[in-house]
């Protein structure tokens, strides 16, 4: 069972992801993930110590080069342009919102991505 802190982080992440158009939450590999059009745009483990998402290629390089304690290449999907971000007491949730939104726009159908980008 997740701790109170993990549930709080997971709730914040869930709120960010599910505000995006047509986003859904599913459980795969015993962990929550968020999808649009059946494609994953963000995922995390139940302990909510990190979130993994697709990143803009240039932004991914910048993130990975900026703080190795905070950003990392995730297993399995790192080679496909995804980045992991550690979630802890100093997490910048506005940044997480921006990164999740970017991931969503990279994964979502163009009409949904355009709607989010123009909002």
Predicted regions and their residues:
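Charge-dense, helix-prone N-terminal extensions
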Residues: 1-119
């Amino acid at each position: 069972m997740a701790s109170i802190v993990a549930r709080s982080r997971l709730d914040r992440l869930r709120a960010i992801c599910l505000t995006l158009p047509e986003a859904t939450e599913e459980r795969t590999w015993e962990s929550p993930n968020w999808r649009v059009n059946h494609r994953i745009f963000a995922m995390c483990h139940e302990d909510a110590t990190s979130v993994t998402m697709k990143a803009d290629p240039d932004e991914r390089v910048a993130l990975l080069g900026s703080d190795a304690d905070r950003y990392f290449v995730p297993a399995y999907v790192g080679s496909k342009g995804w980045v992991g971000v550690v979630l802890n007491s100093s997490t910048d949730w506005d940044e997480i919102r921006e990164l999740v939104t970017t991931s969503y726009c990279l994964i979502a159908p163009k009409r949904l991505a355009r709607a989010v980008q123009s909002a």
